[in-house]
Amino acid sequence: MSEKYPGPLVVEGKLSDAERMKRESNFLRGTIAEDLHDGLTGGFNGDNFLLIRFHGMYQQDDRDIRAERAAQKLEPRHAMMLRCRLPGGIMTPQQWLAIDKFAEENTIYGSIRLTNRQTFQYHGLLKKNVKPAHQMLHSVGLDALATANDMNRNVLCTSNPVESQLHAEAYEWAKKLSEHLLPRTRAYAEIWLDQEKVATTDEEPILGATYLPRKFKTTVVVPPQNDVDLHANDMNFVAIAENGKLVGFNLLVGGGLSIEHGNKKTYARTATEFGYIPLEHTLAVAEAVVTTQRDWGNRTDRKNAKTKYTLERVGPDVFKAEVERRAGVTFEPVRPYEFTGRGDRIGWVKGIDDKWHLTLFIENGRILDFPDKPLKTGLKEIARIHKGDFRLTANQNLIVAGVPEGDKAKIEQIARAHGLMAGVTPQRENSMACVSFPTCPLAMAEAERFLPQFIDKVDGIMAKHGLAEEHIVLRVTGCPNGCGRAMLAELGLVGKAPGRYNLHLGGNRIGTRIPRMYRENITESEILDNIDELVGRWAQEREPGEGFGDFTVRAGIIRPVLDPARDFWE
C-alpha cells in the first residue's frame, strides 16, 4: 500500500450476484440446453440470460417496437446478437460466403455488422436459429466462444497488409494468445455442437471456476499504427522489430474506456507501460496478467471490476511485480516505439510481397444491400473469385488482402459496381459509431443511425473553414460503456438521452490521450454550433500539422486529462 494507492490486494465484502451465477453455472452450462426447447418465450430465462454471453451472445429486442408490443400485451421481440471469435480479424472467402448466406437466410435484419474489435456480429438471431448459427460457424472452422462477458475477448491485431512478414508474425501471436486464454470448459461443445459429455471434471487453470471479475481485452499492436486503440484494452503487446523481424513486445496494462454517467468512481484510463519482454515469455506473461487480475480484481462491484481499477487500487508497481513473480521474468526497460496514426489506408496498397491489398471503407461496418449501394452482394461477388483473404479492421472496414496483379482489375470493377469504392471525405473515413438503437439494450441515444447525416453536416463545417481535406477523429457512442471508443477520439459524443450527448474534446490523433467533457447533455444543433466555432478557430490558429485535439489543448479550450483516476471528472 502507498499514499496514492491505498487499496488492499483483494476487495472483501458481499460478492456481486454475477459471481453466484458463475459459481452455480456448472462451468457455464446453466440450463441453456433445456432453455432452447422452451417455445413459450423468444428469450432465455433466469441465469441463462447472462450465461449465453460466455457463448458469444447477448439477448436483445427491437426497441423501435417495444412500446407497441407492450401495448398489445406481447413480450418484447427477443432476438440474440451473436459475435464471432476471429483473432486478428482474418478470414477466408469461403468463410465469408458461409456467414453471408446464414445472415441472409436466418437473421431478422439480414446484415453482417463489422465491429471495431475486428470481428462480425449477427443481429436479430431468433432463438430457434441460435444453435444452427453456432453449428454453421463450427463447420467453417469458426466459433463464438468467449467473445462476451468475463473472459479474454476477441484478440485484436494491427491490420498492416504492407509489412507482410511482420504482420504475419504478429497475427500468429494474436492467435496464440486467443487460444491460450480460452476457457477450457466443454460447455460450448456440448450445448452447441452436440459433442459427448465426458465423465471428467472441468477445470479452468487460467480463468478459474468463476472466470474473471469482468470483461478483459487484449491487443497485439504493430507500430506506427495504433488502429487497434491499445489504450482501450486491458493487456497490450506492442511489437518490437529488428530488421523487419519480430523480437519481442512492450507490455502495457490497464487501459479501458467504460464509465457510468455521474459515477465518479468510474473513469476512462490509458494503459500503463510495464516493460519489454522477449518473445519466449509472451504466453507466460499474458497468463500472469490474467491470473493476477483474476485473483485481485474487484468481485463485489462490477462497476469497479476491470483491470484499470485493480491497477489504481493496488498501484501499477505492485501489480507489475506480481506479474513478474508469477511469470518468472523481469521486465526490461520499454523499447522505443511511436505511433503516427490509427486510420485505415482506404484504397489499393502494394505489399512488400508484391501482392495488392484493397481497403474498403464500410460506413459503421454495416454490410447490407442498401438501395443505392448493394455492399453485401458486392462482397459476395468478390469472395467468389478472391484467392487471398478478407481482413476485418479495428476501424470497422474490410481489406481484400493478397490480390495478385492479374485479379486486381476484376476485383476493382466488382467493388466499384456495388458502391464499395465510392469516394468519401477524410472526415467520414475517420468517424465511427457503435450500434446503439434499435438493438442495443443499453443505448441512451442514437449512434449508428445518427452518424451518416451528422457527418454530412460536419463535412459542411469543414468545407466552410477551408478544411475539406482535413479530418478530426470523431466517434459517437450511444451510452457511456464506450463501444464506439469515443473516449479516445479527438471529438467524442457520448449518448445521455434521446437526441442528447456529452461532448468530449482533447484526445489526439494517435489515440494516446483521453478527451475531457466539454459540454454536457446537449442537442445535435448545439453540438454543431460548438464544432463550427472550434473548427473555425482551428483553421485560423493552428500550427503546421497540428491536429484538432492537440489544438484544443494548446489553445486552452480544454485541459488535458493527465491522471484519469484523479482528474477525469474535474
From Swiss-Prot:
It catalyses: hydrogen sulfide + 3 NADP(+) + 3 H2O = sulfite + 3 NADPH + 4 H(+). Its EC number is 1.8.1.2. Its cofactor is siroheme; [4Fe-4S] cluster. Pathway: Sulfur metabolism; hydrogen sulfide biosynthesis; hydrogen sulfide from sulfite (NADPH route): step 1/1. The keyword Ribosomal protein does not apply. One of its GO terms (cellular component) is sulfite reductase complex (NADPH). It comes from the Bacteria. It holds the Pfam family NIR_SIR. GO terms for molecular function: 4 iron, 4 sulfur cluster binding; heme binding; metal ion binding; NADP binding; sulfite reductase (ferredoxin) activity; sulfite reductase (NADPH) activity. SUPFAM superfamilies: Nitrite and sulphite reductase 4Fe-4S domain-like, Nitrite/Sulfite reductase N-terminal domain-like. GO terms for biological process: cysteine biosynthetic process; hydrogen sulfide biosynthetic process; sulfate assimilation. Binds 1 siroheme per subunit. Binds 1 [4Fe-4S] cluster per subunit. [4Fe-4S] cluster binds at residues 434, 440, 479, 483. The keyword Oxidoreductase applies. Keywords: 4Fe-4S, Amino-acid biosynthesis, Cysteine biosynthesis, Heme, Iron, Iron-sulfur, Metal-binding, NADP, Oxidoreductase. PROSITE patterns: NIR_SIR (PS00365). Siroheme binds at residue 483. Component of the sulfite reductase complex that catalyzes the 6-electron reduction of sulfite to sulfide. This is one of several activities required for the biosynthesis of L-cysteine from sulfate. HAMAP family: CysI. Alpha(8)-beta(8). The alpha component is a flavoprotein, the beta component is a hemoprotein. Belongs to the nitrite and sulfite reductase 4Fe-4S domain family. PANTHER family: SULFITE REDUCTASE [NADPH] SUBUNIT BETA, SULFITE REDUCTASE [NADPH] SUBUNIT BETA-RELATED. This is Sulfite reductase [NADPH] hemoprotein beta-component. The lineage of its organism: Bacteria, Pseudomonadati, Pseudomonadota, Gammaproteobacteria, Enterobacterales.
